[in-house]
């Protein structure tokens, strides 16, 4: 039995949409909750890896959610611009809200790194799907 990737995504689109909203809220909660006694500034620390990982997951989730609700592929512009604007928006909110958090350029850099890693994974998954469809159509 062969599984159609797009059919599977569209069949579970309500669940996928819910997971996307949950992922978005977790990122907002994690980045906007009141700050703790973490070290002020280090280039490579746990916080930066969390930023990269969260934005990698969020970009991948954006692409999959887009496919669940739109029959065509997500535009690369959407998969690049939306996460980057989300990350910059979070940093602006950290500077405005009274959460004892402060905006950092390095957070934006690691958000962008995670965005591009998520984009690469999304494109790789699409390529694998396209190749398997080509093989299926040849036989």
Can you say where each PLM-predicted feature lies in the sequence?
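Bulky hydrophobic segments
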Residues: 1-106, 112-139
């Amino acid at each position: 039995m062969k599984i159609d990737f797009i059919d599977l995504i569209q069949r579970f689109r309500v669940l996928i949409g819910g997971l996307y909203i949950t992922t978005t809220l977790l990122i907002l909660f994690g980045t906007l909750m009141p700050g703790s006694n973490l070290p002020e500034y280090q280039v490579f620390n746990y916080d930066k890896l969390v930023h990269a990982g969260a934005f990698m997951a969020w970009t991948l989730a954006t692409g999959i959610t887009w496919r669940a609700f739109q029959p065509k592929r997500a535009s690369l512009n959407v998969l690049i611009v939306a996460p980057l604007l989300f990350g910059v928006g979070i940093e602006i909110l950290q500077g405005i809200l009274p959460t004892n958090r402060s905006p950092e350029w390095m957070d934006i850099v690691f958000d962008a790194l995670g965005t591009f890693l998520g984009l690469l994974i999304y494109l790789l998954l699409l390529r694998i799907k396209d190749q398997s469809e080509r093989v299926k159509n040849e036989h």
